[in-house]
């Protein structure tokens, strides 16, 4: 059965401010559609992609280009260097500020991204435990290696382990950090206080997603993913957790001579397709978007937003 959330008072109140969410798996076309919608409704885009929060990571995260950012103002891009982790709580604080500014300025706010937990935390008002980063513990966990860390998390907090990809070192370390700092699993410490918004969720899930992912991966390598990875490795070292994520991990192996470029492209494509499958499962269980048609998502999204704005 799909997960459903109880309707909040704000959701029922047609006078509550409108927050539009465009969600979908990686390579589903969110960026292009978001730009069209933002221009049509005079909105600014608030990023909800966890890797795009970091500086110096543009190619591998498919961050909106400088030209696209010049068309529409974007928030929550390039917040910090990649060696300074951003917690879920810190993301919420930054995102809430951007949402409130947009509501005051435009009368509506526009969230775009595929990081399901970040979207859920913001729109449902989840309150994760306030635990400061523990650099010494993170270094120890990095030395243990991501496979063992994820196994430890699966034993101690299986609910969190199901939500966190086995290769996601940053979120695995954060969940273990909370566990060791507080003595209780993160999944049992999160409360909810829904914000006073009406949330309109629009979803993209194209039938040709596998082909889109394959084309996206080829484009990342042709646009300079390996060189971007080289620069990150030189500045921050090969153990940087974000360099273990999809795309960067394979490019790192190319630089080390452990993978050929064609093999890296194939491996990145496969991992991305697996990740997209997990994203779609999350969206089905944790969100209730209006799924947009493949043939004309812009018209349907525009109609729904116009109705929401009244």
From Swiss-Prot:
UniProt KW Transmembrane keyword: no
Listed InterPro entries: Dimethylallyltransferase, IPT, P-loop_NTPase
Subunit structure: Monomer.
Recorded superkingdom: Bacteria
HAMAP family tied to this protein: IPP_trans
Region (Interaction with substrate tRNA): 49-52
Record keywords, A-Z: ATP-binding, Magnesium, Nucleotide-binding, Transferase, tRNA processing
A GO biological-process term: tRNA modification
SUPFAM superfamilies: P-loop containing nucleoside triphosphate hydrolases
Binding site for ATP: 24-31
Source organism per UniProt: Synechococcus sp. (strain WH7803)
Protein name per Swiss-Prot or TrEMBL: tRNA dimethylallyltransferase
Summary of the function given for this chain in its UniProt record: Catalyzes the transfer of a dimethylallyl group onto the adenine at position 37 in tRNAs that read codons beginning with uridine, leading to the formation of N6-(dimethylallyl)adenosine (i(6)A).
Sites annotated Interaction with substrate tRNA: 115
């Amino acid at each position: 059965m799909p997960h459903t959330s109880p309707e909040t008072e704000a959701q029922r109140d047609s006078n509550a401010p409108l927050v539009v969410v465009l969600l979908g798996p990686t390579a589903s076309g969110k960026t292009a559609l978001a730009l069209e919608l933002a221009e049509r409704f005079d909105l600014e885009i608030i990023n909800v992609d966890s890797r795009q929060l970091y500086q110096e990571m543009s190619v591998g995260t498919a961050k909106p280009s400088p030209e696209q950012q010049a068309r529409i103002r974007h928030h929550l891009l390039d917040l910090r260097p990649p060696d300074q982790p951003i917690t879920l709580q810190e993301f919420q604080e930054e995102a809430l500020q951007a949402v409130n500014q947009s509501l005051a300025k435009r009368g509506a706010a526009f969230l775009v991204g595929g990081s399901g937990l970040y979207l859920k935390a913001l729109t449902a008002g989840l309150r994760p435990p306030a635990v400061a980063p523990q650099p010494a513990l993170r270094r120890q966990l990095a030395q243990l290696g991501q496979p063992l860390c994820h196994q430890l998390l699966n034993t101690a907090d299986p609910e969190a382990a199901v939500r966190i990809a086995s290769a996601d070192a940053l979120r695995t370390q954060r969940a273990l950090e909370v566990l060791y700092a507080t003595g209780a699993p993160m999944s049992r410490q999160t409360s909810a206080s829904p914000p006073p918004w009406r949330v309109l969720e629009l979803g993209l899930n194209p039938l040709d997603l596998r082909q889109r992912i394959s084309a996206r991966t080829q484009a990342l390598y042709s646009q300079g993913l390996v060189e971007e990875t080289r620069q990150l490795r030189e500045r921050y070292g090969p153990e940087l957790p974000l360099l273990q994520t999809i795309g960067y991990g394979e490019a790192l192996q190319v630089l080390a001579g452990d993978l050929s470029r064609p093999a890296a492209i194939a491996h990145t494509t496969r991992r991305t397709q697996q990740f997209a499958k997990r994203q779609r499962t999350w969206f089905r269980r944790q969100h209730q978007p209006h799924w947009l048609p493949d043939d004309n998502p812009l018209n349907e999204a525009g109609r729904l937003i116009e109705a929401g704005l009244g």
